[in-house]
Amino acid sequence: MKPPKIHTLAFLVTGFPPDVSGVSHFNWERAHWFAKQGIYRVVVFAPDWQKEPTSSLGQLDSDTNLIIERYPSKPWVPYTLTHVPKFRAADLIRKKLAYYKPNLIVITDVERFFLLGAWQLPGRRYAREHHIPYIAEYHTDLYNFSASYPGWQWLRNAARSSQLAGYLYRQIDMTICASDAASQSCKELGIANTRTIPFLGIDVCTYSPHRRNRKWLETWLNNKEIDNKVLLFLGRLGFEKRVDLLIKAFARLRQKRSDCSLILAGDGPTEVVNQLKRLAESIPNVHFTGFLLGETKANVLASCDVFCSPSPYETFGRTVVEAMASGIPVVTVDSGAVSEYLLEGVNGYLAPPDDVEGLANVIHKVLLSNNTEIICRALRDANQFSLDQGCQNLSDYYQQLLGISETRKDLTSLSRK
């Protein structure tokens, strides 16, 4: 039997291990998924800011179809925890592309590659000269959440007034959005060539209510708190995540009941973390843990009582789905992509955005409710956001572009059943 033709995929990313953001996790998991399919060779171009990974997430395995090329990078001025390509990285990427001869190029984080980064779109010229697809993925609602950062207003205003986003994305054949909310954000920026494909997902097998055990929380809870109701936020501690809103809502909640604790699991820019700690210092039972990864993260998720995410600008909501798969009720805000799949009173709870009192009231309602049916529905619904399904959706689309498959599947949205 004739072996299948191997197609080479080139992924140009700024988020990749050892960075521990949700985007980095997905880029890593996606690269491995495609490399294991037997019909792709995967080449990832990622920042070189820390070559030796500090967690198992970044450890290479024996996957011969996965190649990781590191390009020269620097901290991105608007958000220095993110690393972006230096100007000279574009030439290195061009030479490597000529060597690997990809059949398709995918660039994520387009704005970060261009603005205050390489000042160009690496791979575009190669794609044009060799007549191959040049695809973008819209992972981060950068323009909306930049409103949360006082120092970013110039970037947001400049991008809108100059129509920079529309100009950049017109250089690309198609922009893939994971949700209708992300697609709408693109359209508001003048990005017309979009397609909605639910490509993001989690490893649902990692998360389970069977992990629930209060011992996993003993590191942070004192003896008086061990029987408390524990609220959890897990993710990046950035202004755009509106953790300040949650801290204020928790203070209001404690006026109604004192038997509750708040765990804030994550990290972020020093100035943001310090500001949040100052906000919380007079409120009892608030605990900052730093980033949690792997088994520890999954165990803590299942062992808390309510997951709270007040972020209004999610293009997917990775930690929300992880919490759903862990068997704890989710409270989030009625905004962004999360409200496309999390339905009030069906598989979770929605609070009004930017409303401290409203968020506190919803959390209080959850603590008073029997959430068994909601948790069961959330567990079922989380399965539709598996990593396998998301990557398969992408693979189906790639195969259309590569001419492998003539079958056209409806990947534009997930049905609400």
Predicted features by range, described:
Residues 92, 208-224, 400-403, 407:
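A short helix/loop element that forms part of the nucleotide-sugar donor recognition site in Leloir-type
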